[in-house]
């Protein structure tokens, strides 16, 4: 049989061969395209926040039957805030793991105005990096080796909340996507005893997200350093009452009130109290308000701290690993009626220089000139 068309006469045998050839090659092309699609990507996108682009680390979704991280958004113009983390959770699809507004709303709020004094909007969303101290610090009674760090009367969560990174670079391969930033912080506008260089890395890999912060004393005087992270983790089901938190902590730091949340200098055991976060089943959040520092932490043989957030209603679990031996406290913040909990592993207790501590070690690391210290946390997903 012959077919006649615009290209002339074609034999049935030739036509069959052409069709067979097309059929055999097409799957190869599709397979090749699939192989060429990168497992991890990095992009720098708008809007500009803090005059720098947003960095987005992304991972290709591989197995929808398992929980896995999908993307991370970072704000190098605002102290390398880990603004959003997304993950695929079976039954829920891709969800936000951090309590954050849209990037456009964040840009409007992070404007240096009255509500953003000292970068305060940065610790209201996402996950702010806290340096050179975590938690709260009074200005007046602050005393370190007879010196007065020149903070405000009441400073929150360090001095880099509104800082733009001095330099940023990114990298990707088949196993991870990462961003690296450096901040030449100096003496924080004459508010700290010596000069500091900060190196911050954020890495999205096959099974985890990791954050590392290294502080180096590049000045001529010894200085104290406290580092922390302030992520607002969502409760995906929205049912806060049944969600549970497990922290291997034996103690709770008492505060004078929940307005200023300054410590009294007293520490009490959590066993048998409404604040026992150490029980194996976890503390059920219920209707309880939390804004408390937990101490007396138990760690594994490698000095790692493991915290668990469990939302059984969503079949969602999150391991929050503190991988720095200098992490001495965990701040938990979860207002009653809100479907999130801030879980903040940190070096130091609140108001670490206060006289209420009466000489107690409050977790600040002392760095001599040229010395450095590294803070690290790692997130892993699991099905409870």
Question: Residue spans of the language-model regions?
Answer:
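Short, structured beta-strand/loop micro-motifs enriched in basic residues and often containing a Trp
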Residues: 131-132, 353-359
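Bacterial N-terminal signal peptides that target proteins for export
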Residues: 1-11
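Beta-strand-rich interaction surfaces with strong enrichment in secreted/lumenal proteins
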Residues: 199-201, 362-367
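C-terminal motif of bacterial Sec signal peptides marking the signal peptidase cleavage site
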Residues: 20-21
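Beta-strand-rich N-terminal accessory domains
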Residues: 27-145, 301-327, 371-382
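Acidic, contiguous internal or C-terminal segments within carbohydrate-active enzymes
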Residues: 57-81, 85, 89-91, 183-236
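Extended, loop-rich substrate-binding clefts of extracytoplasmic carbohydrate-active enzymes
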Residues: 33-61, 143-206
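Active-site/ligand-binding surface loops and adjacent short beta/alpha elements
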Residues: 124, 232-324
